[in-house]
Amino acid sequence: MGEERWVSLTPEEFDQLQKYSEYSSKKIKDALTEFNEGGSLKQYDPHEPISYDVFKLFMRAYLEVDLPQPLSTHLFLAFSQKPRHETSDHPTEGASNSEANSADTNIQNADNATKADEACAPDTESNMAEKQAPAEDQVAATPLEPPVPRSSSSESPVVYLKDVVCYLSLLETGRPQDKLEFMFRLYDSDENGLLDQAEMDCIVNQMLHIAQYLEWDPTELRPILKEMLQGMDYDRDGFVSLQEWVHGGMTTIPLLVLLGMDDSGSKGDGRHAWTMKHFKKPTYCNFCHIMLMGVRKQGLCCTYCKYTVHERCVSRNIPGCVKTYSKAKRSGEVMQHAWVEGNSSVKCDRCHKSIKCYQSVTARHCVWCRMTFHRKCELSTLCDGGELRDHILLPTSICPITRDRPGEKSDGCVSAKGELVMQYKIIPTPGTHPLLVLVNPKSGGRQGERILRKFHYLLNPKQVFNLDNGGPTPGLNFFRDTPDFRVLACGGDGTVGWILDCIDKANFAKHPPVAVLPLGTGNDLARCLRWGGGYEGGSLTKILKDIEQSPLVMLDRWHLEVIPREEVENGDQVPYSIMNNYFSIGVDASIAHRFHVMREKHPEKFNSRMKNKLWYFEFGTSETFAATCKKLHDHIELECDGVGVDLSNIFLEGIAILNIPSMYGGTNLWGENKKNRAVIRESRKGVTDPKELKFCVQDLSDQLLEVVGLEGAMEMGQIYTGLKSAGRRLAQCASVTIRTNKLLPMQVDGEPWMQPCCTIKITHKNQAPMMMGPPQKSSFFSLRRKSRSKD
């Protein structure tokens, strides 16, 4: 039989769909409730085939926005069109999609596309409510082949909601067992607790559909899933129960990786954390020693120890993963190397001769210290942690807590879910500074996910925490009694502020210093701390070595209190009550708010720094002509340290309150001071005299705020592009009070909102220890400029 293929979305469209899913606050289960009584889709039957109009309504309920017309149409066609057939009866295994295209396929695609376009045309409500008869006499599909076509060539295309829901649920984050159970109940339409062969094939076809988008080679996955289906039906009666379905899925590792393996609970119990990977150089299976082949993702690789296997070998009797903690703390216990064989195309650390990638049996490397040796060259069995020993928590430094006193709980505590959570004690190596790594996987697109995997390998997985799993608190509690530990915040400025808030609430006797690995765009705080505007794929080992030598600086943090007037209606929720970077009101907040609203509606248009800059330019240009915040002085009152600032003679459209010398991704609104004329004030008295303000220096640890006026969007653009050095200096003070009498756009640390009439008070809260990045190396041209300025 010829191999059948789905009509697929393009990779760009698939990325679009993923971004819409990530930005939506709803889960697929929430969208299904719209078909219940009182929901927006109550007039439709979810068990019947649905038309394009109902499909659009369902996607709007799920994603909370309307999909772009091309993406919506193509996604609908992906579920309604006939699968494409190979022209040959015996196709080459692993053939590309392009080889499957034929003239008949193109005609069929064009015919269906025309019908979909007709279906996409505005219909009356009666047409939208029209239902198609269910295909009850469907022929049972053979295992692992696409289902029977569900649209006739003479009728408008329709889709089955089950297929759409199953497909979308695979894109969502969540536990694999929950996804398996959800898909089972979704296709168990008669609610008898059993799935027949055709229903299981429909589910597996959707899994293969997703696998192709993730660049998996289905030639390996297809027989594994087929074997899984055969193994589930123990009594060979053609039906599978929920228990059999979940058990079969949870014991098939490639399927777990496809569903999104949850490795949060496997840090140290000997279980591997598998991920599909494409290898850029020849790589061999650690089990069978045969090279991994394929043009897509060729095999499974453990995130923790880099043990690599074929998909077919992963279920064999392979060695367990490295242990990340010691079972019991014994006096005098020493750390031994944890060896992994093969795939080390580097030089031997003893004889300094090259190790070939195929020498899987003759060479191995240590997971902890990264030392690589030929077997004949191995020296001591003792491991000291290697070049990252100052940061890494070796397994001998972590042991479970034991309680010997009567009446106390055993070696763990019960979580909110009723699960037993192990508690640990950290006894670091003397003279070291263990590093707590907190990663926001959503920052920088998928950059955060890659950073998380890399740190899992570079350090002990137990000291690396995913902020999606409970936020910063679990990591801070794990390190609570650890002396001299440091924190690395991987994410944007919002992530850093979140971590600093949690450190405040944790009530540490001594606050740990925080370094920043900036992800995404903006990152004004990271720029001021010399960590750069965004991680661009450099060596993480070098960044960790820089943290070892980082000097400390105290960062001022400010309390932001917004007091609305009693007679006005409630506006948007204030994003933060603490300010770390800046607060602004007026023209720049208006542009930021429009940018924020547009990004929520169309996240796929904001997936690069260049696109973000172009959108800011467009919004800034339109704001220049609209001037929505002109005559700002008529609508606000400004007080600095209790003294009013006269704005009547100044034509401003915006006011910014600065704590750090960076805004809008590196722009300094306060401006630079000549070093020979700058004055660092020791007193905390406010300054509003324009002559004195010329010599006031901005410092993120002086417990002072800088107040700057903006004349409009045009001036903002000039400052951003360097055509103008700074805005208008209004004051330098220790507290600010602003009163407004109309609805105005505001933003704090890059998060905008619309605020009705209110009183805003900004006062000093505390200081947080931060680590500075290494000084930037001066280039030849910067040295020339400095020498000219001295002359």
Swiss-Prot record:
<dbReference type="GO" id="GO:0006654">
    <property type="term" value="P:phosphatidic acid biosynthetic process"/>
</dbReference>
<keyword id="KW-0547">Nucleotide-binding</keyword>
<keyword id="KW-0106">Calcium</keyword>
<dbReference type="GO" id="GO:0005509">
    <property type="term" value="F:calcium ion binding"/>
</dbReference>
<dbReference type="Pfam" id="PF00609">
    <property type="entry name" value="DAGK_acc"/>
</dbReference>
<dbReference type="GO" id="GO:0046834">
    <property type="term" value="P:lipid phosphorylation"/>
</dbReference>
<keyword id="KW-0472">Membrane</keyword>
<dbReference type="Pfam" id="PF00130">
    <property type="entry name" value="C1_1"/>
</dbReference>
<feature type="domain" description="EF-hand 1">
    <location>
        <begin position="175"/>
        <end position="210"/>
    </location>
</feature>
<protein>
    <recommendedName>
        <fullName>Diacylglycerol kinase gamma</fullName>
        <ecNumber>2.7.1.107</ecNumber>
    </recommendedName>
</protein>
<keyword id="KW-0677">Repeat</keyword>
<dbReference type="GO" id="GO:0160195">
    <property type="term" value="P:negative regulation of phospholipase C/protein kinase C signal transduction"/>
</dbReference>
<feature type="compositionally biased region" description="Polar residues">
    <location>
        <begin position="94"/>
        <end position="103"/>
    </location>
</feature>
<dbReference type="InterPro" id="IPR002048">
    <property type="entry name" value="EF_hand_dom"/>
</dbReference>
<dbReference type="InterPro" id="IPR016064">
    <property type="entry name" value="NAD/diacylglycerol_kinase_sf"/>
</dbReference>
<dbReference type="InterPro" id="IPR029477">
    <property type="entry name" value="DAG_kinase_typeI_N"/>
</dbReference>
<keyword id="KW-0418">Kinase</keyword>
<dbReference type="InterPro" id="IPR002219">
    <property type="entry name" value="PE/DAG-bd"/>
</dbReference>
<feature type="zinc finger region" description="Phorbol-ester/DAG-type 1">
    <location>
        <begin position="271"/>
        <end position="321"/>
    </location>
</feature>
<feature type="binding site">
    <location>
        <position position="237"/>
    </location>
    <ligand>
        <name>Ca(2+) 2</name>
    </ligand>
</feature>
<feature type="binding site">
    <location>
        <position position="233"/>
    </location>
    <ligand>
        <name>Ca(2+) 2</name>
    </ligand>
</feature>
<keyword id="KW-0067">ATP-binding</keyword>
<keyword id="KW-0963">Cytoplasm</keyword>
<keyword id="KW-0443">Lipid metabolism</keyword>
<keyword id="KW-0206">Cytoskeleton</keyword>
<dbReference type="InterPro" id="IPR018247">
    <property type="entry name" value="EF_Hand_1_Ca_BS"/>
</dbReference>
<dbReference type="GO" id="GO:0046486">
    <property type="term" value="P:glycerolipid metabolic process"/>
</dbReference>
<dbReference type="InterPro" id="IPR017438">
    <property type="entry name" value="ATP-NAD_kinase_N"/>
</dbReference>
<feature type="binding site">
    <location>
        <position position="192"/>
    </location>
    <ligand>
        <name>Ca(2+) 1</name>
    </ligand>
</feature>
<dbReference type="GO" id="GO:0005886">
    <property type="term" value="C:plasma membrane"/>
</dbReference>
<feature type="region of interest" description="Disordered">
    <location>
        <begin position="768"/>
        <end position="791"/>
    </location>
</feature>
<dbReference type="Pfam" id="PF00781">
    <property type="entry name" value="DAGK_cat"/>
</dbReference>
<dbReference type="InterPro" id="IPR038199">
    <property type="entry name" value="DGK_typeI_N_sf"/>
</dbReference>
<feature type="domain" description="DAGKc">
    <location>
        <begin position="430"/>
        <end position="564"/>
    </location>
</feature>
<feature type="binding site">
    <location>
        <position position="244"/>
    </location>
    <ligand>
        <name>Ca(2+) 2</name>
    </ligand>
</feature>
<dbReference type="GO" id="GO:0046339">
    <property type="term" value="P:diacylglycerol metabolic process"/>
</dbReference>
<dbReference type="GO" id="GO:0035556">
    <property type="term" value="P:intracellular signal transduction"/>
</dbReference>
<dbReference type="GO" id="GO:0008270">
    <property type="term" value="F:zinc ion binding"/>
</dbReference>
<dbReference type="GO" id="GO:0005856">
    <property type="term" value="C:cytoskeleton"/>
</dbReference>
<feature type="binding site">
    <location>
        <position position="188"/>
    </location>
    <ligand>
        <name>Ca(2+) 1</name>
    </ligand>
</feature>
<feature type="zinc finger region" description="Phorbol-ester/DAG-type 2">
    <location>
        <begin position="336"/>
        <end position="385"/>
    </location>
</feature>
<feature type="region of interest" description="Disordered">
    <location>
        <begin position="117"/>
        <end position="154"/>
    </location>
</feature>
